Amino acid sequence: MKLREIVARNLRQLRNAKGLSQEELADRADINRNYVGLLEREQHAATVDMLEKLAAVLEVDPIDLLRARD
């Protein structure tokens, strides 16, 4: 599985677990909502800085966005 796919799946799962829309996550992370959509559709690779912002809003360690899950 590609890292981009892992990040997309984890981001979507963690966002949904927090009950956040893409727009709410983007607002709280101070990023563009379209960017969140691109990440979740595997159309863009997140930077390390972006992973940190998203993880902070989701209240997880950034590595949780990169970790493959079964």
List the model feature ranges, each with a label:
Residues 1-6:
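A detector for short, charged/polar N-terminal pre-domain segments
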Residues 9-27:
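Short basic helix-loop element that most often maps to the first helix and adjoining turn
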Residues 11, 25-26, 36-39, 65:
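Conserved hydrophobic/aromatic packing and binding residues within compact polymer-binding modules
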Residues 11, 22, 33, 48-51:
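Helix-turn-helix DNA-binding elements, focusing on the entry/boundary residues of the two helices
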Residues 31-44:
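Recognition helix of helix-turn-helix/homeodomain-like DNA-binding domains
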Residues 41, 60, 70:
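Short, conserved catalytic or interaction motifs in soluble domains
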Residues 49-64:
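DNA major-groove recognition helix of helix-turn-helix/homeodomain DNA-binding modules
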